[in-house]
Amino acid sequence: GMVPGFVAGHYTLDQCVIQLEPLLKGTDITWLPRSVTALDANAKRVTLDDGSALDFDWLSVNTGPVQDRKKTGALLPGAREHGLFVRPIESFGALWPQVLAMAHTQPLRLAVIGGGAAGIELCMAVRHRLPKASVTLINGSSELAANYPERVRQRVSQALKARGIVVLLERASHIQAGEVTLESGATLACDMPLIATSAQAPAWLQSSGLALDEQGFIAVDAFQRSPSHDRIFAAGDVSTRMDQPLPRSGVYAVRAGPALLTNLTAVLAGVPPVPHLPPKNTLNLLSCGDHYAIATWGDYSAQGRWVWWLKDWIDRGFIKRYSRP
């Protein structure tokens, strides 16, 4: 996404998000700016955060993953009290300027907790924006960028080292004011921990009655349909393809959109749905903060300023495509 570019100072927050209300203007779609608090799949009812309920005949879920503060706080004590969560972007975007203001008064010691693509990109974005700050990546596992091919892991490691970012290949055990304690017992002085741990399934799915995977995400088949409730479909990071597990990536979420539309249209017309076949390889672009990026396509990889400009062109184009004046 474009959040690392926002952190690095390349974009404003408004340039990183798609405003749904203007996009839906002039359509027959009813826009409800609410959050879901409960889903009863058997009763075909969704409950919203204002207490209202919506009954449905068919349901499509694409709420995306969340950073469950309560769950994260249980796994990493002190995270809720002392950490800055990168999700949701609206909350993070409102608080990030306060970190920048702090950096004007003192050299900051920052730690990014979470060694996935989000944490890696965030580290390098912070380094670009705050060159005087010390930046540490607490990876959380024994291998950096574990989901990438070996050559890409080497590129990522070299990029972090070249930017003076310290990488710790162990987990954080708890956070308190001014420091992060690691599982080894060592402590790291830290003015602001940035929480970029793996996203989680929304808590309300647990009591929904839907078939879920081991991590609590909605299980779906090749039609993006729930195997337990055939009138409920799901796509994007909130779901898991049980026939073909996929990385939780925006690319796969976007590719599932047209297939979801096709199948919803089909079942409403009484026509059998068709399987969605995700591509074997997708273009993965990892930004390095300073107008530089690493590209991955299957086993092929490349890096350079041209990769960043390609990523910038793709990201801006996607936002523009779904934005209205």
Segment roles from a protein language model:
Residues W31-A38, L54, H128-A222:
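A Rossmann-like FAD-binding core segment of flavoenzymes
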Residues D290-P325:
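C-terminal auxiliary extensions adjacent to catalytic cores
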Residues G64-Q67, A199-A201, H291:
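Short glycine-rich anion-binding loops that position phosphate/pyrophosphate groups of nucleotides
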Residues A79-Q106, T187-R255, T262-N263:
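FAD-site-proximal beta/loop scaffold in flavoenzymes
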Residues G1-W58, P149-V166:
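N-terminal Rossmann-like dinucleotide/flavin-binding domain of flavoprotein oxidoreductases
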Residues L95-T136:
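Rossmann-like NAD(P)H-binding beta-loop-alpha module
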